Structures are given as C-alpha cells and as structure tokens.
Amino acid sequence: MKNSVSRRDALKTLAGAAALASLSRVSAAEPASPTSAAMPTPSSAAEPAEQFHHSVCRWCYQKTPLDELAKNAKEMGIGSVELLNPEDFPTIKKYGLTCAMVFNPTAKTPQGVTVGGIPKAWNRLEYHDTLVEAYEKRINEVADAGFENLICFSGNRDKMDDQQGLENCAVGLKRILPLAEKRGITLSMELLNSKVNHKDYMCDRTPWGVELVKRIGSERFKLLYDIYHMQIMEGDVIRTIQDNHKYFAHYHTGGNPGRHEIDETQELYYPAIMRAIKATGFKGHVAQEFVPARDPMTSLRQAVKLCTV
C-alpha cells in the first residue's frame, strides 16, 4: 500500500514550515489552553475500566514450593497459579486461587508412545484414540475442580504438511468438544515458536491457529497467545492482538531474547501490549511465564506491576 504522505509531500511541508518559523515562535510563547490540556486522548477515554486478571506459571518457579508460590501470589494480587496437574489443585485452593490454565494430560499409546505433550499430539490420527481418552478424563477433572481452561498442543510436523496437520487436529479435537461444551471447559492450543525453543512444532504461527479455531467452530476451542513465542516467529504483537483477539482465550508473557524478566532488559514493551489487550475488553488471565534471572519473587512482583494498566 502506498503511504498517505510521500517523501515529496514531506519535503514540501518542511519548506512551508520554514516560512512559518516566526509565527511558530510567537505561538510557542503563548500559554497552553487549560481546557485542552485537561482533555483525555480518545484512546484513553475509550479504554475499558476493568482490568484483566493475573496468573503465574508454576514451572518457572520449580525451586519454590507450590505452597510458598501460592502464598506469595495471593499477596501480590495474582489470582491464579497455572499449568498444574489435578493433584496440585487443593494447595492453591487453600489460598483462594484458581488455576487459569490446567496442564495437559499425557498417556501411552498401545505402541508405547507417550502422547499429549508438545511434540506428539493432535496432528497425528494414530494418537487420537489415546488422546481422546486422556483428555476426556482431564476435562472432567478440571470441571469438577471448578476451573475452566485446559491447554493442548498440535504436535511437531515430523515432515507432515501443515494443511494435513490442520485437518487432523480438527478431526481429533472435535471428538472431545461435545464433552468440553457440556462441562464448560475451554480447550486452548498454545502458539509456540519453532525457531528457538520448540523445533518443528506445527502450531507456530497465528494464521494457522486461527484457521484451526475457525474449522472447529466452537466457543470452547481457542488459542493461547504466547507473546514471547510469537515475537520470535512473527513480531507485530499489538496488531496481531487487535486483529485476532476473539480467537485468543489466554495470554503468556516472557522477555525476548532469553525468556527472562519482562523489564527494560529485553525488547518487548509490555505496558503497551497490556494496554492493547485491555482495550479489546479481555476479561481472562494474562500469565507470567518468564524464567527469573534475578530474585524470583521480586521479579514476579515487578512484572505484575508492569502489567497492571
């Protein structure tokens, strides 16, 4: 698309500005209008007042006992500790916390292949029977606990065409959606990078994931948009959120490069990203999924403050 202001137009504007220099100096000396200075910008005036909710991913704090992590999370105003298995639910419930995204189940196929994790999952038809059984059990566990979200993965390509993988994922996931819909559980497939952390992972770009959501056609299947991972694969994070937020059920953070703190030591400007998420009217959870390089609880507290907009 051609820019609305060309280089030639810009040069003409600069030439005209020189002729108005004296007038500009006079205008600059005049005090600003108190009324105009107090008026909010259109973007801030349009922002929803309600803040989305905060969560933290358990695996990033493995050296911290879950009980201690839950206690600290509660004190920081974090409402969820996530990526937990059912045996961990009672611990966080003691502190009045939820699990905003429950960990995926894994199981062995009759051939002894462990499926359900990142590399081997829904893009293989031969895994579907095992996955359906494992996920139906986990869906019931999540619902019985009073939680609402369950993570899932595409699996790696392993030389499979992306379109074939898309079709296979849709076939398999549609088998468990009736139960998910009945129990009020949203399945969220995570977008992960295949460049640095998860080589060969299939659901590694937003358009692929969005197409899968459209094919499945259920409000109980959406995407987990991981800001760190998609910065590596696509960039253009804020525009992607603005254009596709209706397909996203959950968000993860992380500093890039390195997946450490989300502060000024990395390239993403999280306050602006959080404002973009808030502006969509999102009422779900944004989870901190960075690996602390400094004191873990101090870094977590700083991240939550940074993401409260």
Residue ranges and their predicted role:
Residues 90-103, 185:
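Short acidic, glycine/proline-enriched helix-loop-strand junctions
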